[in-house]
Amino acid sequence: MRPNLLAAAIAVPLSLLAAQIAQAGEGMWVPQQLPEIAGPLKKAGLKLSPQQISDLTGDPMGAVVALGGCTASFVSPNGLVVTNHHCAYGAIQLNSTAENNLIKNGFNAPTTADEVSAGPNARVFVLDEITDVTKDAKAAIAAAGDDALARTKALEAFEKKLIADCEAEAGFRCRLYSFSGGNTYRLFKNLEIKDVRLAYAPPGSVGKFGGDIDNWMWPRHTGDFAFYRAYVGKDGKPAAFSKDNVPYQPKHWLKFADQPLGAGDFVMVAGYPGSTNRYALAAEFDNTAQWTYPTIARHYKNQIAMVEAAGKQNADIQVKYAATMAGWNNTSKNYDGQLEGFKRIDAAGQKLREEAAVLGWLKGQGAKGQPALDAHAKLLDLLEQSKATRDRDLTLALFNNTAMLGSATQLYRLSIEREKPNAERESGYQERDLPAIEGGLKQLERRYVAAMDRQLQEYWLNEYIKLPADQRVAAVDAWLGGNDAAAVKRALDRLAGTKLGSTEERLKWFAADRKAFEASNDPAIQYAVAVMPTLLKLEQERKTRAGENLAARPVYLQALADYKKSQGEFVYPDANLSLRITFGNVMGYAPKDGMEYTPFTTLEGVVAKETGQDPFDSPKALLDAVAAKRYGGLEDKRIGSVPVNYLSDLDITGGNSGSPVLDAHGKLVGLAFDGNWESVSSNWVFDPKMTRMIAVDGRYLRWIMQEVYPAPQLLKEMNVGK
């Protein structure tokens, strides 16, 4: 999920880092900063040189890859990639049927010939180069003058040209990242591997043990890991899926640690964290806490209940909506945890006090501080503008995101954009984007059931007719033809006649021109044609606000950074899906008075949670192996068993899932897959006492592959077999 560049995560300029007081735990450091914080890294226990881990194409960093929403790493010279089970969940679900349910049973390819495609849109991105383009980006924006919409379009044009030049070399995918709300811009160039195959996934009763009950919780006992393999053409260059392709040979791959990890040991994570908001305005925080999180969580829970009920009657729904449900569950529980955490640490009060101090400092500077004060006022005004239509915007977006309407609106928009020169098309509809659009159309039926889609459409139409008059959309009202349950039923009955449920039909429209859409009698396409002018108008309004933000946000954030520097504080960029490193130590925590959590869980803890019912229904092979104390030489004598999961004080967020956890020597000791319940609010206000990362221990991964769901071929490939 790609965040809008123009609303990229708020951060502070890296040049203002006060490295001398940086410490382990808090901080998502860009690799270029690592030599500056060499002291804290060494103090925490790093044995490698900071210069070595800041070499992004060397060992070990060159082994870390992005999946587009998750992180992974190469673990063999033959293109084997390890990530989280939940990151591979979509691929597992895509290859599952009610009769052959890989989600439940697992997948273990005996040979590379038996590996299956992870889907047409599965990707492995291997970082090749990072270039600072701040000067050119700012010049392009400045040339647009005072017109807000022109500023947005100027940045878009700059980005498109920059990316087109970067991607002139075949096989690469490039992306422009904004830091500090527009104070810094960097271009990332990645090798784009397009043939990704599922090699191994443990049964769901291992990979998702504890399910949504244990999600975000400690103690934890989840084997959250899976393996892909990256393939390329025989010439070694990226190519679409083909039986003739061969495994990719990375320059670097991670080796499993040969020293046992213990409490207090140094660990670090390299990955692609999605978004944090630690430098957001207090009012922006308040809007999120009071409306955004509660509202989205409520809608997701309602939809979860709908799909669960339907799934009990239809196994096809249960399988096809598994990945969607996992996402809804994860997000809604995360938001609940953040809201609880906000209250526990008085996040609202902290944000208000911090902002009051900054504003007071600026006022004390007289004329020098006025531009930042004006920028702050402008940001508040922009927030109020967005709040005025937030219910409409959310409802319309999620209604249009249901399967058939999502396909119809995307396809019609594509036909409109195709009338323009490629450089002038909206991002997401350029020639570079067509394979992803086509891939999504091809795999939609594996995640769609008509009866379920109708229920979801009905849910959002019922939400729409509840909107106040000033938030209604004339085009939708005209299409709906009423404001009651009868009108909703008529609309649903019309939409049921769409033919877009067929892959063949969707691909036909993928190649159609605009006139064909506007002459169509398909009800989903007719809806898209009816509402598109309004959608385009609303998009222009958002871009105008984004242009205002481009002028105000960097000014205020620069002032915020200056204030922090004056107070002797260190600063680091908010997460924005770019490569980051976080470091710290293995340690437990005390969630409540009189309660102390140790940092490791064990095999015996898995058995203690066993109920025989989902989600605590371990495979018989696991229970038998634990009962026989068949540890396979992987036990840690300090805890008397094989460690399953462990805690550390590292700073991660969504997007870090699947990130390799490295020890002091750069060896693999596990995979990041979650945070504890008390940590989720740290996306906004970091709490060092409570924030902990949860990782699956590398020894548990190996134990499962050795004793429970054997994959000797992969263990041998990773040079860790018996």
UniProtKB/Swiss-Prot annotation:
Technological use: Designing engineered forms of this protein with the ability to produce custom dipeptides potentially may have a number of commercial and industrial uses including food industry. Maybe useful for drug design.
Biological process (GO), any one: proteolysis involved in protein catabolic process
Effect of substituting S657A: Loss of enzymatic activity. Loss of enzymatic activity
GO MF term set: dipeptidyl-peptidase activity; identical protein binding; protein homodimerization activity; serine-type aminopeptidase activity
Cystine connections: C70-C87, C166-C174
Result of changing D224N: Decreased enzymatic activity to 0.15 percent relative to wild-type
Pfam families xref list: Peptidase_S46
Active-site residue list: H86, D224, S657
Protein name: Dipeptidyl aminopeptidase BII
UniProt organism field: Pseudoxanthomonas mexicana
